[in-house]
């Protein structure tokens, strides 16, 4: 028997809820306020079937462009034929949560401003670029027991 090509195909683990989180949605999910221009993460709740986005958008971050009483309009960028296309989705509130993108970005900006201010006081130029992790420096490995060479050699017949 061939496999189906349904709308929710291959989402058994993707939409599964974590251990001890099954059941109804918490009330705080509904009481969260969203404003136009905020960043949100689309996280599909498998127990709520209405207003569920397509599986490709699970885990994506988007920008709110419309707020309705029970759903939110989100702009998500998707790659189609090698170019980014702006997709506008209407997702129910159960499948959306506030994103930490702005908080992480603002923390980085504050750290960069502080580093620049300290560099100006010291008269040095500070690079604020994010560099990948550098390789570790060379270290000489020593054994736990110091090896002693034999002092007397004799022929073995």
UniProtKB/Swiss-Prot annotation:
<dbReference type="Pfam" id="PF01157">
    <property type="entry name" value="Ribosomal_L21e"/>
</dbReference>
<keyword id="KW-0687">Ribonucleoprotein</keyword>
<dbReference type="GO" id="GO:0005840">
    <property type="term" value="C:ribosome"/>
</dbReference>
<protein>
    <recommendedName>
        <fullName>Large ribosomal subunit protein eL21</fullName>
    </recommendedName>
</protein>
<dbReference type="InterPro" id="IPR018259">
    <property type="entry name" value="Ribosomal_eL21_CS"/>
</dbReference>
<dbReference type="InterPro" id="IPR001147">
    <property type="entry name" value="Ribosomal_eL21"/>
</dbReference>
<dbReference type="GO" id="GO:0003735">
    <property type="term" value="F:structural constituent of ribosome"/>
</dbReference>
<dbReference type="InterPro" id="IPR008991">
    <property type="entry name" value="Translation_prot_SH3-like_sf"/>
</dbReference>
<dbReference type="InterPro" id="IPR036948">
    <property type="entry name" value="Ribosomal_eL21_sf"/>
</dbReference>
<keyword id="KW-0689">Ribosomal protein</keyword>
<comment type="similarity">
    <text>Belongs to the eukaryotic ribosomal protein eL21 family.</text>
</comment>
<feature type="region of interest" description="Disordered">
    <location>
        <begin position="110"/>
        <end position="132"/>
    </location>
</feature>
<dbReference type="GO" id="GO:0006412">
    <property type="term" value="P:translation"/>
</dbReference>
<dbReference type="GO" id="GO:1990904">
    <property type="term" value="C:ribonucleoprotein complex"/>
</dbReference>
């Amino acid at each position: 028997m061939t496999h189906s090509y349904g709308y929710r195909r291959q989402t058994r683990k993707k939409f599964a809820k974590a251990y001890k989180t099954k059941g109804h949605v918490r009330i705080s999910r509904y009481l969260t306020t969203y404003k136009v221009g905020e960043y949100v993460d689309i996280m599909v709740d498998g127990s709520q079937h209405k207003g569920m986005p397509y599986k490709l958008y699970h885990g994506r971050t988007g920008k709110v462009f419309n707020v309705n009483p029970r759903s939110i309009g989100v702009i998500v960028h998707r790659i189609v034929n090698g170019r980014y296309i702006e997709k506008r989705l209407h997702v129910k509130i159960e499948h959306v949560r506030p994103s930490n993108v702005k908080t992480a970005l603002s923390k980085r900006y504050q750290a960069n401003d502080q580093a620049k201010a300290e560099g100006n006081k010291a008269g040095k130029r500070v690079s604020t670029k994010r560099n990948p992790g550098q390789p570790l420096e060379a270290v000489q490995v020593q054994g736990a027991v110091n090896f002693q060479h034999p002092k007397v050699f004799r022929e073995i017949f």
